Amino acid sequence: NSATTAVYSFQDWVSA
């Protein structure tokens, strides 16, 4: 689901 993917992408960006 794209909403879940967006959350993971956001978390990856924040932790970068």
UniProtKB/Swiss-Prot annotation:
Keywords: Activator, AIDS, Apoptosis, Cell cycle, Host nucleus, Host-virus interaction, Ion channel, Ion transport, Transcription, Transcription regulation, Transport, Viral penetration into host nucleus, Virion, Virus entry into host cell. Coiled coil: none annotated. GO terms for cellular component: host cell; host cell nucleus; host extracellular space; virion component. It is found in: Virion; Host nucleus; Host extracellular space. The keyword Nuclease does not apply. One of its GO terms (biological process) is symbiont entry into host cell. HIV-1 lineages are divided in three main groups, M (for Major), O (for Outlier), and N (for New, or Non-M, Non-O). The vast majority of strains found worldwide belong to the group M. Group O seems to be endemic to and largely confined to Cameroon and neighboring countries in West Central Africa, where these viruses represent a small minority of HIV-1 strains. The group N is represented by a limited number of isolates from Cameroonian persons. The group M is further subdivided in 9 clades or subtypes (A to D, F to H, J and K). Involved in the transport of the viral pre-integration (PIC) complex to the nucleus during the early stages of the infection. This function is crucial for viral infection of non-dividing macrophages. May interact with karyopherin alpha/KPNA1 and KPNA2 to increase their affinity for proteins containing basic-type nuclear localization signal, including the viral matrix protein MA, thus facilitating the translocation of the viral genome into the nucleus. May also act directly at the nuclear pore complex, by binding nucleoporins phenylalanine-glycine (FG)-repeat regions. Homooligomer, may form homodimer. Interacts with p6-gag region of the Pr55 Gag precursor protein through a (Leu-X-X)4 motif near the C terminus of the P6gag protein. Interacts with host SLC25A4/ANT1, SLC25A5/ANT2, SLC25A6/ANT3, SP1, CDC25C, RAD23A/HHR23A, COPS6/HVIP, TFIIB, UNG, SF3B2/SAP145, KPNA1 and KPNA2. Interacts with host VPRBP/DCAF1, leading to hijack the CUL4A-RBX1-DDB1-DCAF1/VPRBP complex, mediate ubiquitination of host proteins such as TERT and ZGPAT and arrest the cell cycle in G2 phase. Interacts with ANKHD1. This is Protein Vpr. It comes from Human immunodeficiency virus type 1 group M subtype B (isolate CDC-451) (HIV-1).
